[in-house]
Amino acid sequence: FFSVRDPKNGRIDRFITVANQETKDDGATILAGNKKVLFARLSDAKFFWENDVRMVRAEGMALWINSLAKVTFHNKLGSERERVERLAKLSKDIAPYVHADPELAEQAAMVVKADLASQLVYEFPDLQGLMGSYYSNICGLNPEISVACQEHYAPLGPSDKVPTAPVSVAVALAEKIDKLTSFWVIDEKPTGRKDPFALRRAALGVVRLLLENELRLPLRDAFSMSYPGADQDNLLN
């Protein structure tokens, strides 16, 4: 499906579908089938969204954060809950270098992965980060935290925008530095033929975050503050 957005209000209210065959009814049957599939998916999304919102309003995001203990980050690196603890500490340590409030950066890092435990993101993984920003807004968290939920994965590629909000930058740097150091420790390094954990992208993300925001960060110190046992000299060579 190709979404069509109304330029006046920004809403997606149409879609385009493509078929490689002609039909006697000028595609009416194909269109009806696609409408049925799309309606079912959107109905599922609405159901999961409403369930998530009820849970967030009743319990906040703490239940999701704790349930990340059951979500594996990597079988040699523990759970997403353990990773969240590392990100919170590292974000707080990095914050002064990027002009962010350390306590706010730490709080943001504690919730940016919470939506991984939500029903909607479980069914629609591409929405991770975006849904975290919505849920944190519902919880009444600081707006900078909501922005960080959506932006901490960025930049995802050369054409992706780099976050500029200080808290977002702190958490985004921590996310990428933790990924680099942790996978280096277990000797899962990229090669000329493969990079299954997108470590090159993470490294380029660190560089872009610093250069495009005109920031300076002692990387040796950042690596040593990250995953236990990381060899900062090996990472920088």
Map each language-model feature to its residues:
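Amphipathic alpha-helical "coupling" segments that flank catalytic cores
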Residues: F1-N237
